[in-house]
Amino acid sequence: MPLRLIFMGTPDFAVPTLRTLAAAGHQIVAVYSREAKPSGRGMKLQPTPVAQEAERLGIPVLTPKTLRTPEAAAEFAAFQADAAVVVAYGMILPQPILDAPTFGCFNLHGSLLPRWRGAAPINRAIMAGDPEAGVMVMKMDIGLDTGDVALTGRIALTDAMTASDLHDALAPLGAELMVEAMAQLERGELTFTKQPEQGVTYAAKIDKAEARIDWAKPAHAVLRHIHGLSPFPGAWCELPIEGEAVRVKILRCELAKGSGEPGTLLDDRLAIACGDGAIRILQLQRAGKQPMQAQDFLRGTPLQPPLAVC
């Protein structure tokens, strides 16, 4: 018998899970998402990606500012859900919310717990040079991503993979895992494993202040920094263009041959020296412009070495 579910999520990452649960035949009685925000040139209020998908599916959407009032808890409990599915909702669930569904609340988290608990696991896994990443279905408790784990999906990481690439790979994988978890829950077969006490790390929210590239670091670290922050907020540097230092986001790069003073342009194909080795820019973006492949950028803005990149 299909489950009565409450779905709680906000960004694009959560949409495949909502869509797949609905396609699996579960009765999604309500969707909780964050409030609409001004967006675009006209700064019109734009519902979240999850709210838009819920409206397309004909599911009621709730966007409370808080879940910590008795009224919010009563409204949540009134749905008499078997379970709540939480994917990047963006709000901490208080104990009355966690306790309301018959079988509890289940979170899809984008890391291999207990590594990278917290807000930015995808970015931090790439920035740290982890060999693999993944998603886990866990039963939520009051702690920060400390619940018992039910199912795990893994993806090998490569030097070429950006945070955007990993996001797009984990979202559908996570959707499949959550559908399987709900199927096992429905059959009374879902089992859990406690997280190890060793290996706990925290994925702090990305701060724009950490986005500037430090060319004194080894090339591999610079590459991971760039790819871990791509596309948002975007690792940046200043290129000397027509006598001015112009801020440019670097979205994709590769390791390159060569060496020199860190931050020196080594050739006419955007190879830049790092503290050890070099990287070559493959994709970049100027402020207010669309992302460009490096070869297209160089057609309009040829740069000749040696130049100092800040």
From Swiss-Prot:
EC number of the protein: 2.1.2.9
Record bears the keyword Protein biosynthesis: yes
Function field: Attaches a formyl group to the free amino group of methionyl-tRNA(fMet). The formyl group appears to play a dual role in the initiator identity of N-formylmethionyl-tRNA by promoting its recognition by IF2 and preventing the misappropriation of this tRNA by the elongation apparatus.
Family according to the record: Belongs to the Fmt family.
Superkingdom of source: Bacteria
SUPFAM superfamilies listed in its UniProt record: FMT C-terminal domain-like, Formyltransferase
GO molecular function: methionyl-tRNA formyltransferase activity
Protein's name according to its UniProt entry: Methionyl-tRNA formyltransferase
Pfam families in the record: Formyl_trans_C, Formyl_trans_N
Keyword Transferase among UniProt keywords: yes
Entry keyword set: Protein biosynthesis, Transferase
Record-listed (6S)-5,6,7,8-tetrahydrofolate binding positions: 111-114
PROSITE patterns: GART
Signal peptide: none
Broad enzyme group: transferase
Annotated catalysed reactions: L-methionyl-tRNA(fMet) + (6R)-10-formyltetrahydrofolate = N-formyl-L-methionyl-tRNA(fMet) + (6S)-5,6,7,8-tetrahydrofolate + H(+)
Classification via PANTHER family: METHIONYL-TRNA FORMYLTRANSFERASE (PTHR11138), METHIONYL-TRNA FORMYLTRANSFERASE, MITOCHONDRIAL (PTHR11138:SF5)
Lineage, uppermost ranks: Bacteria, Pseudomonadati, Pseudomonadota, Alphaproteobacteria, Hyphomicrobiales
